[in-house]
UniProtKB/Swiss-Prot annotation:
This is Inosose dehydratase. It is an enzyme of class 4 (lyase). Its cofactor is glutathione; Co(2+); Mn(2+). InterPro entries: IolE, IolE/MocC, IolE/XylAMocC-like, Xyl_isomerase-like_sf, Xyl_isomerase-like_TIM-brl.
Amino acid sequence: MFNSDKVKIGICPIGWTNDDMPDLGKENTFEQAISEMALAGFKGTEIGNKYPKDVKVLKKALEMRNLQIASAWFSSFLTTKPYEETEKEFIAYRDFLHAMGSKVIVVSEQGHSIQGQMETPIFDGKYHFNEEEWNLLANGLNKLGQLAADKGMKIVYHHHMGTGVQTTEEIDKLMSVTDENLVYLLFDTGHLVYSGENPVEILKKYVHRIKHVHLKDIRPEIVSKVKNEKLSFLKGVRAGAFTVPGDGSIDFEPIFKILAENNYEGWLMIEAEQDPSIANPLEYAIKGRQYIKEKASI
């Protein structure tokens, strides 16, 4: 199905320790997390807050476990702060990831985002960009995309619950106002289904701009609870809205099929934030890896 020389399977550290809610997984160390990732059969990871900031130290720890850094999250504030502030932070981030051998940089606009607000209802409190803000976002992302290209890298935009780019319409808008040769898309199954979007249709439409994939499943009964009880994104995570592929309601087979048929190259990353005291990270990592092996033959 997939070309195993071109597609790698990784997992994000958020199942072990949650950067947005540090009490979740506070007992789990960096070394434990990456050791269990390797044990579960993964080849890569993204960067979490507990990871060493020194390139040599991080590389040594990963190389001992045959792991690579696939990417890392970068928060842009192009709609709410001067561009120069975002650019300065981005360049430092880009250079660190480049030194680690990463090819893509995950970017998500956090201007007006409610994803990190503990009390704001995720389905009712979302902000919508005006035209001026869309222009700021598009121009800024194009510039960041060029800065990434200068190092042989790509930026992949992460559509996300509670942000200005969440829905199908907003993803369409983002793709239409940005340069297709500078700004690419991160495809996240869980965030699309959570939002009520059709992931297969979005994948078909933008498969050639998708350069990074987050595989995340949802528990629909928890998402319904979040909606009915007007819970925040973070409270939804605590309640168990997300889980690993194969443990929720999303059918990943057509997604794998479309990616493979279009010769997708890059990382398939499990990213499934939940409470590690309830969902044992190693157990769920193994469960997710086995599901991918069964359904994607990789």
